[in-house]
Amino acid sequence: MIGLIIVSHSKLLADGLHQLAAQMQNKQKCHIITAAGVDDETHPIGTDAVKVMEAIESLSDAEHIILLMDLGSALLSAETALDLIDPDLAEKVHLCSAPLVEGAIAITAAASGGASIDEILNEAQQALQAKQQQLNDTVTTTENEKDKHTHFSEQALTTQWVVKNPSGLHIRPAAKLATLLSGFTATLELRHGEKRADAKSMNQIALLQVRQGDKITLVAEGVDSQNAINAFNQLAQHNFGDNIATTDSKTFVGKTAYVPTVAGLAHHHAPNTELCISSYQTSENETRRATKAIEQLKTHLDSLANTLNEQYGEEIANIFRGHRLLLEDDELVESITQSIENECNTAYDAISNIFNNMSKQYQQLDDEYLQARFIDIEDLKNQLLMSISSVAQPSCAFTEPTIILSGNLGPSELLRYRNTNVVGVALANGSPYSHTCIIAAKMGLPILTDLGDNIHQIAEQTKLQLSIETRSLIVAS
């Protein structure tokens, strides 16, 4: 395993780069941490040798540890940290002079593909070449590098592919391809016209500057050549990991039209409040009711995810697959069972209490993204309670363009309005980081959150304008 430490004056910068590099990361082969900023709220910009030392020590199990630094004093902190740690551990550490962003991506991609430490460091040092070539900047190459093309025998295998990705083989598909092919014992070369690249090198693939519609050729020779060809073809069929929209045999790519304002009639979303709360029977009966509700919802989520995968893509489908996984959590099911058996709660009350506690825990988190997941928890709770009460989601039909008003809206509640005349959503509360907002964007629905409780005073059927541009809901006079 390779350890990568991002040493920066700014924690925000390091965390952002960590997030970007994680897109290329195989966590079994590459571990990334940051050592950035100083613990001073007033003046947080700076570097701390002790932080760097602790970061290195936390990766002591790694085969090699690579440090990437942003500016001069970060390098000094890294060098000081090496003086503070055990000499045997220090021998594993490599200080890398590659550019911070490009170097981090190159190191992550190469390490995730199982490259050797020398290959990883070489990839990092060459990380600027793709950008330099695209900008016609000066790139210094040695004579050996210019004549580095591999010579293949007549036994070499080849396969070709016309790239469909709208952005060509940009950094993510290039990283996926290099990572995939790095595992094969074979000499592999990717060709684009007269250009050639080591197919195990993300940087070299990027240097080919492959665009949509370009034909590329993979040449393979060695023990695993056929397996490498097969793997390449399979990844190519999936557009090198990119999720792109295709229709039949042609793909038409255009620009999104920005619609800043929509108009429609107000409709207040009505949560299901008429739920049947039965009296406690026996713990066996209540447990059976709770289990039945959970199993029914899991089946529904499976079906919904498959439908949404076809309609909106895997990203949206995975939201509901995640909901299903939560319902499979043994600890959750055990908590509901214990609430029924030990506290003589009904299935309704047990589910309500457990999910309410879980929702509160999420709302208390500092991370806004994780905090917003309480909306999913509330949504799952409501669906389970409706199942126990034998209440179905009401169907919706609107003859006029409509803007939905609500305090909050769960993902499943929003989906009630797909394929209807709903043109926008306005929430008194909610969160811009919620799955509801992600789904709304995929549905093409403008949505505003945190508008305040005054929207509940708007009369039904009032004419409204919802403006994304000004982030406002306007009541027509």
From Swiss-Prot:
GO molecular function: phosphoenolpyruvate-glycerone phosphotransferase activity
GO cellular component terms, semicolon-separated: membrane
Enzyme category, top tier: transferase
Domain HPr: start-end pairs: 156-243
UniProt entry keywords in alphabetical sequence: Transferase
Gene Ontology BP annotations: glycerol catabolic process; phosphoenolpyruvate-dependent sugar phosphotransferase system
Annotated stretches, region: PTS EI-like, N-terminal part: 269-477
A Pfam family of this chain: PEP-utilisers_N
Record-listed E.C. numbers: 2.7.1.121
InterPro entries in UniProt: DhaM, DhaM_N, HPr-like, HPr-like_sf, PEP-util_enz_mobile_dom, Phosphohistidine_dom_sf, PTS_EIIA_man-typ, PTS_EIIA_man-typ_sf
PROSITE patterns: PTS_EIIA_TYPE_4, PTS_HPR_DOM
Presence of the UniProt keyword rRNA-binding in the record: no
Reaction(s) this enzyme catalyzes, per UniProt: dihydroxyacetone + phosphoenolpyruvate = dihydroxyacetone phosphate + pyruvate
Something else known: Unlike the carbohydrate-specific transporters of the PTS, the complex DhaKLM has no transport activity.
Comment field on protein domains: Consists of three domains. The N-terminal dimerization domain has the same fold as the IIA domain of the mannose transporter of the bacterial phosphoenolpyruvate:sugar phosphotransferase system (PTS). The middle domain is similar to HPr and the C-terminus is similar to the N-terminal domain of enzyme I (EI) of the PTS. The IIA domain of DhaM (via phospho-His-9), instead of ATP, is the phosphoryl donor to dihydroxyacetone (Dha). The phosphoryl flow likely involves HPr ('His-15') -> DhaM (His-435 -> His-170 -> His-9) -> DhaL-ADP -> Dha.
Self-association and partners: Homodimer. The dihydroxyacetone kinase complex is composed of a homodimer of DhaM, a homodimer of DhaK and the subunit DhaL.
Protein family: Belongs to the PEP-utilizing enzyme family.
Protein's job: Component of the dihydroxyacetone kinase complex, which is responsible for the phosphoenolpyruvate (PEP)-dependent phosphorylation of dihydroxyacetone. DhaM serves as the phosphoryl donor. Is phosphorylated by phosphoenolpyruvate in an EI- and HPr-dependent reaction, and a phosphorelay system on histidine residues finally leads to phosphoryl transfer to DhaL and dihydroxyacetone.
Name the record gives this protein: PEP-dependent dihydroxyacetone kinase, phosphoryl donor subunit DhaM
Gene from which the chain derives: dhaM
